[in-house]
């Protein structure tokens, strides 16, 4: 005969694991990748702005593996090739803090894709 306590404990652990997995799920987010000044990166998508890194401060794990994002069109707005472009990022995020908590991959996109998206605010 199975102990009811053991069954409940097992169910509780399974539920806790599924909640943790949901919080750590990798999402594809597409929008304006902004790099206005050295060390500052953010993504502006349909749901708002997500901080990827701040100069002298927060750095999302994985940002060092970001490829050259200027290959599909990049608008230079500041010295040293700083500006913005259109991109899709595979990321984990913290909804409350609006931080990218892990950058898994990044793909530059043509500027036209973001410009034509009616749900995407301007950069």
Residue ranges of predicted features:
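Bacterial N-terminal signal peptides
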Residues: 6-16
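Positively charged n-region of N-terminal signal peptides that target proteins for export
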Residues: 1-4
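N-terminal secretory signal peptides
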Residues: 22-77
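Beta-strand-rich cores of mature extracytoplasmic or soluble domains
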Residues: 64-123
């Amino acid at each position: 005969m199975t102990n009811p306590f053991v069954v409940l404990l097992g169910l509780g652990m399974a539920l806790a694991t599924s909640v943790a997995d949901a919080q750590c799920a990798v999402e594809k987010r597409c929008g304006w990748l902004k790099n206005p000044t050295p060390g500052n990166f953010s993504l502006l998508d349909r749901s708002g702005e997500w901080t990827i890194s701040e100069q002298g401060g927060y750095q999302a794990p994985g940002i060092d593996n970001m490829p050259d994002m200027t290959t599909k069109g990049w608008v230079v707005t500041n010295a040293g090739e700083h500006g913005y472009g259109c991109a899709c990022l595979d990321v984990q995020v913290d909804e409350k803090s609006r931080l990218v908590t892990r950058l898994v991959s990044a793909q530059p996109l043509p500027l036209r894709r973001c410009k034509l998206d009616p749900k995407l605010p301007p950069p």
